[in-house]
Amino acid sequence: MGTRTPPPFERFLSEHGATVMRFLVVAVGSAHADDVYQETFLSALRAYPKVRDDGRLDRWILRIASRTAIDHHRRVAKGPTPTPMPPDRAVHDPEPLDDGLRDAVAALPAKQRIAVVLRHVMDRPYDEIAEVLGSTEGAARANVSAGLKSLRERVG
């Protein structure tokens, strides 16, 4: 598979925006998903002129989204969390989760949370999870496994 010039950014955004938002709603929560979404696509826009489309742009944008989500969690952990402003538009949760499960997912370490969300919410294969996390497939499997174990212990 050769590389080619990627589609215009607007089309790229419309093709992948919903997938990224779905991922971020679970990865960082509804209250922060819009902000992290904007940060993700600003980073992508800056890098986009240098990107070659090898058929894996979906993995590329999810890698940016996962790193932006991890950065978000680091910022939150460093200092007091400001009270989020309600979004101007409603953020649609991909699937309703009960509060206990949502809290348990939010409490997972960032890489485990991202791995579990990609595997069990977005149904992504382990090789893609590894690529998004910048790890090996074995490490991706280990993050999913450890995350699920923690969820079972917390939720019961």
Write out the residue ranges for each language-model feature.
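Short, charged helix-capping/linker segments at alpha-helix termini
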Residues: 2-11, 21-39, 49-55
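A short pre-motif secondary-structure segment
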Residues: 115-119
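DNA-recognition helix of helix-turn-helix
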Residues: 66, 70, 133-156
